From Swiss-Prot:
PROSITE patterns, per database record: RIBOSOMAL_L13 (PS00783)
SUPFAM superfamilies membership: Ribosomal protein L13 (SSF52161)
Keyword rRNA-binding: no
Protein name: Large ribosomal subunit protein uL13
Alphabetical keyword list: Ribonucleoprotein, Ribosomal protein
Record bears the keyword Transferase: no
InterPro entries reported in the protein's UniProt record: Ribosomal_uL13, Ribosomal_uL13_bac-type, Ribosomal_uL13_CS, Ribosomal_uL13_sf
Name of the coding gene: rplM
Molecular functions (GO terms): mRNA binding; structural constituent of ribosome
Record organism: Alkalilimnicola ehrlichii (strain ATCC BAA-1101 / DSM 17681 / MLHE-1)
């Protein structure tokens, strides 16, 4: 018997909606990354994007443990000397709550062309409403 290898045209992708209200950031992000990669499917193939679409709602209500709300920092460099920008979790969750989940999940995906394709299947919304009702996403309990 030959080893099965999924082909990109044969992959069936489902849509799921996840409520982030009260969930811990890292635990939610690891489960979302796992499903974006498609590792929960029996036809998972490492070199093919077999993952599902994930819609995360209520990103503004995500929780972190301990003092991470004030201590956790997000850094970015503009490319110019001395231009390292830093922002705390508290300020980022007020300014752009979607970015917190996007950055956490992106850090758990492969750092290559396949990882960039996987992150495009993640849709994050600050509030409880999303605009993907036409895809009929199934609720996913994490």
């Amino acid at each position: 018997m030959k080893t099965y290898s999924a082909k990109p045209a044969d992959v069936q992708r489902d849509w799921y909606v996840v409520d982030a209200n009260g969930k811990t950031l890292g635990r939610l992000a690891s489960e979302v990354a796992y499903r974006l990669r498609g590792k929960h499917k029996p036809e998972y193939t490492p070199h093919v994007d077999t993952g599902d679409y994930i819609v995360v709602v209520n990103a503004e209500k995500i929780a972190v443990t301990g003092n991470k709300a004030s201590d956790k920092m997000y850094h970015q460099h503009t490319g110019y000397i001395g231009n390292m920008k830093s922002i705390s979790f508290e300020k980022l969750i007020d300014k752009a709550p979607e970015r917190v989940i996007e950055k956490a999940v992106k850090g758990m995906l492969p750092k290559n062309r396949l990882g960039r394709a996987m992150i495009k299947k993640l849709k994050v919304y600050a509030g409880g409403e999303h605009r993907h009702a036409a895809q009929q996403p199934q609720p996913l309990d994490i």
